[in-house]
Amino acid sequence: MLISGSLAAIIHLFLSRQQEHDGFTQQEWMISIEQMMNECKESQAVKTAEHGSVLICTNLSGQDIRFDIYHSMIRKRVDGKGHVPILDHITAMKADIENGVVLLKIESEDQKVYQTAFPVYSYLGGG
């Protein structure tokens, strides 16, 4: 029941999106950050590459989960394969890791800047 309820909410989110909007909604932002945070939480190592435009989480199986910019979206790839859109309508992404915390800054197509931070559990002895 919980899964179908969550799925219905996500489908509604994408079907009800206004096409003329050049950015993304707050709900899309929150879902995307939650996905990235969960990958980092379940990883044995987290690092950035390409001057912060790529966030790489190495999971317990040794797979590299990579979040990078592709056209106007952030996508997720596993070991360089696949293509899962995470957040659309972006122009820039910058990730840093400081003192066990991922600092993420994203600029949308409508020139808004979004920032967040979340702990990297592998640095803190968890995960």
Curated annotation (Swiss-Prot):
Signal peptide: none annotated. The keyword Cell membrane applies. One of its GO terms (biological process) is establishment of competence for transformation. Its main location: membrane. It is found in: Cell membrane; Fimbrium. Pfam families: ComGF. It is a peripheral membrane protein. Disulfide bonds: none annotated. One of its GO terms (cellular component) is plasma membrane. InterPro entries: Competence_ComGF (IPR016977). Keywords: Cell membrane, Competence, Fimbrium, Membrane. Required for formation of the type IV-like pilus (T4P) that plays a role in transformation. Involved in transformation. Transformation pili are dynamically extended and retracted, perhaps thereby promoting DNA uptake and transformation. Required for transformation and DNA binding. The transformation pili are flexible filaments, consisting mainly of the major pilin ComGC and smaller amounts of the minor pilins, including at least ComGD, ComGF and ComGG. Interacts with ComGD. Interacts with ComGG. This is Competence protein ComGF.
